[in-house]
UniProtKB/Swiss-Prot annotation:
<dbReference type="GO" id="GO:0006282">
    <property type="term" value="P:regulation of DNA repair"/>
</dbReference>
<dbReference type="Pfam" id="PF21981">
    <property type="entry name" value="RecX_HTH3"/>
</dbReference>
<dbReference type="InterPro" id="IPR003783">
    <property type="entry name" value="Regulatory_RecX"/>
</dbReference>
<dbReference type="Pfam" id="PF02631">
    <property type="entry name" value="RecX_HTH2"/>
</dbReference>
<dbReference type="InterPro" id="IPR036388">
    <property type="entry name" value="WH-like_DNA-bd_sf"/>
</dbReference>
<dbReference type="Pfam" id="PF21982">
    <property type="entry name" value="RecX_HTH1"/>
</dbReference>
<keyword id="KW-0963">Cytoplasm</keyword>
<comment type="similarity">
    <text>Belongs to the RecX family.</text>
</comment>
<dbReference type="GO" id="GO:0005737">
    <property type="term" value="C:cytoplasm"/>
</dbReference>
<dbReference type="InterPro" id="IPR053926">
    <property type="entry name" value="RecX_HTH_1st"/>
</dbReference>
<comment type="function">
    <text>Modulates RecA activity.</text>
</comment>
<dbReference type="InterPro" id="IPR053925">
    <property type="entry name" value="RecX_HTH_3rd"/>
</dbReference>
<protein>
    <recommendedName>
        <fullName>Regulatory protein RecX</fullName>
    </recommendedName>
</protein>
<dbReference type="InterPro" id="IPR053924">
    <property type="entry name" value="RecX_HTH_2nd"/>
</dbReference>
Amino acid sequence: MDNTSKINKITKIEVQKRNKKRVNLYINDEYAMAFSTELAFKHNLKIGQEVDYKELKVIAEEDNYIKCKGDALKFIEKSYKTERQVYDKLLSKGYDNKTIERVIDFLTEYKFIDDWRFGELYIEERLKREGRNKIKYSLMQKGISESIIDEKLNCVDRDKEKDALNKIAEKKYKSILKNEEDKTKIYNKLGRFLMSKGYLWEDVKSVLNKLLYSDG
């Protein structure tokens, strides 16, 4: 018989043994679904109560949202994450797009995720050891939009950026000198290293000339 045409009554609401925050619902003496105790109270579900499957579908969607939100909050609790990172994580756990988007809206509204802030903090921390090209690539891989990245990078103090480059270059230069004396080889080796760190060529060229060919 079609479930939508017969009377469906709740015959049992059972708290799960392994998770006291969830209950099992039985309809007409058959297991129907499981959901949070929060929803059982919210919908005032009782034994003997008649229910229709439209109502159960609503409860199932709400329960899925609650679980999805819980997984999202757990994912971001130890470190700041981008919207893309959260989305991909939830998608990998099997949640549907509609539920994920709803959770993303919640996280964004309450500032649990903020791509602008993430970009700012990431750039500030990475500038100590990487150039803007590598930083930009990494942020794009994390799902930050190029417009946000460019705006944040344009606010970077160029003197601080060059100071960081100089320190890294000097340290690597001293290391290379232990095994190499030819200036051309040092120039090429050090140049490749600094470029791999994501620094701009004009900055790299300047520091190479300073280290290798400056009289001072």
